[in-house]
Amino acid sequence: KADGALRFKVFRMGAAIVLSDALPMLENMGLRVLTEHPYEMDMPGLNVFIQDFEVEPQVPLGENLDHARERFGVAFEQLWRGRVENDGFNRLVLAAEIDVREVAMLRGYCKYLLQTGVPYSQAYVERTLSAHPAIARLLVELFHARFDPDREHRAHADQARRRMERDVGTVVGDNVRSKLPALVGHVLDGYIKPRHEQLTIIEQALGELLELVSSLDEDRILRAFKELMRATLRTNYYQRVDGKPKDYVSFKFDSSKVPNLPKPI
């Protein structure tokens, strides 16, 4: 923040980024661009272009922007380089306080869900998750609790708990807190439990949050994500090559547990 305004600066060597390319990306990430101020720095043998965007968030932001700043910057770079899709799922980087790889995981489940023949568009699914950031975040926590091989290591669990505790003020709105005052504490306490108890606690919390969803269509979509995760047998999400995550996410499903899956002919 600067002078009470929220700003996003892009530094690039050689040439400025094309504004018409950047705007849709920023909008899909939950920022409305109000103004742009371009600058150029002439250095010996080097031109550095600075684009200073004044932006207005379309999703709630926490008071401490340090972690959001880093996470958003990484996501925008990956998006700009064409390594992730430019769609409304990227809004969850800010709305649900998740990183770009966690967004890719949710996007992957959506792609599979659409293949099962659900009567919703991807854009509608994107809007549904963005409208319910607490549920989106708990779906991510459910995925980690099910599949993260380090989840039961105390140091790793403590780190996950601290992250959730830091983000919960943004992700869980006042309306949810007033209706479910014990939910946050219950979820945070679950991180020190064995894996099967973590799963039970997260699923219970998801069930309570889903009871607050008024739209039948949105309820069906969000429950479908939960059921797809329960039907997942394994994933490559945590596998690394040369110390880095793979550039794709894959899942293996037990098709008998996938809800409303058409029977083979």
What are these regions (language model features)?
Residues 1-31, 35-265:
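Non-catalytic interaction/regulatory segments
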